[in-house]
């Protein structure tokens, strides 16, 4: 396998991983600490990722307990969650922040599915952009007589197969997220 294909697969794999992370951040009916991954907390004047400041527990299906390592920032964590667009109402008992997720309405589910489809399309576009960049490299090599025309055609076909494989992975992630969102 050529270096161009290996490099393209690596980049496409990271595009799929990014899509997976984006899907994890979309709220479903169940509690999932990953929904707090992108949340930044103002900690001593510096925006800090929440997962660096606290541990997470899921004691019940729709409850997340967030226990800050530094108890002095409990109010900051609560404020960051309240100000976010996660749609949860945090309560704080001085030591931990408890987030009870409300049941998703049909309208909210459809909104999240639409968001998931948008994230999937962004992932597909990223994969196709990698293919385009790799194809450009292959064509340049053929133009510079580093590879033959037959080799160029073979590499382009191989890139198309690799692209299809990674786009299908994103489609599977989307399908799984949609079924998770439609679960009641």
UniProtKB/Swiss-Prot annotation:
Its main location: cytoplasm. GO terms for molecular function: ribosomal large subunit binding. Keywords: Cytoplasm, Protein biosynthesis. InterPro entries: Ribosome_recyc_fac, Ribosome_recyc_fac_dom, RRF_sf. It is found in: Cytoplasm. GO terms for biological process: translational termination. It comes from the Bacteria. It holds the Pfam family RRF. GO terms for cellular component: cytoplasm. Responsible for the release of ribosomes from messenger RNA at the termination of protein biosynthesis. May increase the efficiency of translation by recycling ribosomes from one round of translation to another. HAMAP family: RRF. NCBIfam families: frr. Belongs to the RRF family. This is Ribosome-recycling factor. It comes from Cutibacterium acnes (strain DSM 16379 / KPA171202). The lineage of its organism: Bacteria, Bacillati, Actinomycetota, Actinomycetes, Propionibacteriales.
């Amino acid at each position: 396998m050529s270096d161009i294909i290996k490099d393209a697969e690596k980049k496409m794999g990271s595009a799929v991983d990014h899509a997976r992370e984006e899907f994890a951040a979309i709220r479903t009916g169940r509690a999932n600490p990953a929904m707090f991954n992108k949340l930044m907390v103002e900690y001593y004047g510096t925006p800090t990722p929440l997962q660096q400041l606290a541990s997470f527990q899921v004691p019940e299906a729709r409850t997340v307990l967030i226990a800050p390592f530094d108890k002095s920032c409990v109010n900051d964590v609560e404020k960051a969650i309240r100000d976010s667009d996660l749609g949860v109402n945090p309560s704080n008992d001085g030591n931990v922040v408890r987030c009870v997720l409300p049941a998703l309405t049909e309208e909210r589910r459809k909104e999240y599915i639409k968001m998931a489809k948008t994230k999937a399309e962004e992932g597909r576009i990223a994969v196709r952009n990698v293919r385009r960049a790799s194809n450009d490299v292959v064509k340049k090599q053929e133009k510079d007589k580093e590879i033959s025309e037959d080799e160029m055609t073979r590499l382009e076909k191989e890139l198309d197969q690799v692209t299809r494989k990674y786009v299908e992975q994103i489609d599977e992630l989307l399908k799984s997220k949609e079924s998770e969102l439609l679960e009641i």
